[in-house]
């Protein structure tokens, strides 16, 4: 498992020294020209998926392609509802699904995982009940190359639990949280060292 620090500024890049991977959120800051000596995930999140990018899809994909050429990321994060043509990047693809209202049932999430076009699938849904925890655990135990967790303060533990169920990444923050229930990089590192 690798610790991913989600970044929204160059100052946070300095705070992410202990991260294994950095997620460069170009919807929050223009990282072009930034020197990053770690594995990188390039993300430009739409407003509907918890980000700040407000333009149309064509503009967003073009922005990502320009940033791709400048930053040379190891991964690009693309939403699961995009057409196949958007998945034309020469790197590993994280196909992501976000739901800030609820956690869909297992069969719907299973469809997302089994229909994936990316190398990894990231599922982040709003947690409301124990049943939601069960749904995410089922996805993680039945599939490989899946990052899946529940959003919300009450369910922040699922971010670490997911790593022990095979999730390749734990998304963390440095500076300030970028999503509901996101845990700090320092806290994640401490929890992992205590759990072994």
From Swiss-Prot:
Q: Which UniProt keywords apply?
A: Amino-acid biosynthesis, Aromatic amino acid biosynthesis, Lyase, Schiff base
- List the active site: 98 (proton donor/acceptor), 122 (schiff-base intermediate with substrate)
Entries under Pfam families matching the protein: DHquinase_I
Its UniProt entry gives the catalysed reaction(s) as:
3-dehydroquinate = 3-dehydroshikimate + H2O
Question: Is the Signal keyword given for this protein?
Answer: no
- The EC category is lyase
Detail which positions bind 3-dehydroquinate. 23-25, 45, 159, 182
- Report a single Gene Ontology molecular function: 3-dehydroquinate dehydratase activity
Known partners and oligomeric status: Homodimer.
Supply the name of the protein. Answer: 3-dehydroquinate dehydratase
């Amino acid at each position: 498992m690798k610790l991913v620090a989600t970044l929204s500024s160059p100052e946070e890049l300095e705070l992410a020294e202990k991260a294994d991977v950095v997620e460069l959120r170009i919807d929050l800051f223009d990282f072009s020209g930034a020197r990053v000596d770690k594995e990188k995930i390039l993300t430009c999140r739409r407003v509907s998926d918890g980000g700040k990018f407000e333009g149309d899809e064509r503009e967003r994909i073009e922005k990502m392609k320009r940033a791709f050429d400048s930053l040379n990321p190891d991964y690009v994060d693309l939403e699961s509802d995009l057409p196949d043509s958007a998945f034309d990047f020469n790197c590993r693809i994280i196909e992501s699904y976000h739901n800030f209202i609820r956690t869909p049932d297992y069969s719907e999430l299973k469809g997302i995982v089994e229909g994936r076009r990316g190398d990894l699938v990231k599922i982040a849904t709003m947690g409301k009940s124990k049943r939601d925890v069960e749904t995410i655990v089922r996805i993680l135990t039945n599939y490989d190359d899946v990052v899946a967790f529940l959003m919300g303060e009450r369910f922040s533990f699922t971010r670490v639990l997911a790593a022990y169920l095979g999730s390749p990444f734990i998304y963390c923050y440095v500076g300030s949280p970028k999503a509901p229930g996101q845990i700090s990089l320092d806290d994640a590192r401490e929890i992992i060292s205590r759990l072994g």
